[in-house]
Amino acid sequence: MAVDITLLFRASVKTVKTRNKALGVAVGGGVDGSRDELFRRSPRPKGDFSSRAREVISHIGKLRDFLLEHRKDYINAYSHTMSEYGRMTDTERDQIDQDAQIFMRTCSEAIQQLRTEAHKEIHSQQVKEHRTAVLDFIEDYLKRVCKLYSEQRAIRVKRVVDKKRLSKLEPEPNTKTRESTSSEKVSQSPSKDSEENPATEERPEKILAETQPELGTWGDGKGEDELSPEEIQMFEQENQRLIGEMNSLFDEVRQIEGRVVEISRLQEIFTEKVLQQEAEIDSIHQLVVGATENIKEGNEDIREAIKNNAGFRVWILFFLVMCSFSLLFLDWYDS
């Protein structure tokens, strides 16, 4: 079981500081030094990895803030009719789509480049694990931002489809309004004629007598404009046909809407799979590089073994030759 010795450590440090003061030893740049040398952090060379990783995270965060800031303007399909969100056009939305896709692709390439350089550099196992964890975190952050963008784009496409469907279902101008406008034009034309011809003002009774027969004929013609049963039946059939066409168009729009949402979901899955495949390709590349290095080391070991075996054979041959000469010398000496 672990024991807390913090108080003992502090007491020991205080004792050492008191003893150094009594002996007049300068600690931490003098008696009034800001910190002891014991607690000073050793100078550690800072690499380029941390700054580049922070830069990538900053860029991804800026993209996320931009998407959230312009979310209402981006997903709103009725900006031309609403003054509150009338600050963005369809061209600007398309430009945002293009820039966001390029930006996410660039960030993904930067992450893969950092991962490759981190594998190439020679560091301890702890530093490698730390950098791998940092890159995994950045990649997960980028995936979440990509998911946010995909959701916003799907909502925008869905609203555009709804807008087109509603525009197709708008009613045509009423015939009554046409008649009212035509009657207004007719009523305005006599007034203009009266202004242009002031001589008619001197004969109001004659004008009234001329207009009354016209009103009578108009009233008689109103009765003649009533529809016959055959015409009513024909118009009902035409209405049924139009309703059927509208229903079929509505079903097609719903199918297209579902397909668009499905395409956006598949695009998101495809993006995740592509990122996973890139990570797997990098790992396979590292394994291939490691296998190549192992093969080189094995070839060098084989060469050394061949050299050692050749030297060993030379020594054995030398020993046998010397033994043969020794036997011949002894045989000659005995004879």
Curated annotation (Swiss-Prot):
Q: Which parts of the chain does the record assign to the membrane side Vesicular?
A: 331-335
Transmembrane regions: 310-330
CDD domains the UniProt entry points to: SNARE_syntaxin18
For this record, an example GO cellular component is: SNARE complex
Q: Which InterPro entries match?
A: Syntaxin-18_N, Syntaxin/epimorphin_CS
- Membrane topology, as annotated: Single-pass type IV membrane protein
Entries under PROSITE patterns matching the protein: SYNTAXIN (PS00914)
Provide the alphabetized UniProt keywords: Coiled coil, Endoplasmic reticulum, ER-Golgi transport, Golgi apparatus, Membrane, Protein transport, Transmembrane, Transmembrane helix, Transport
Gene3D superfamilies annotated for this entry? 1.20.5.110
Assembly:
Component of a SNARE complex consisting of STX18, USE1L, BNIP1/SEC20L, and SEC22B. RINT1/TIP20L and ZW10 are associated with the complex through interaction with BNIP1/SEC20L. Interacts directly with USE1L and BNIP1/SEC20L.
Protein name as annotated:
Syntaxin-18
Biological source species = Homo sapiens (Human)
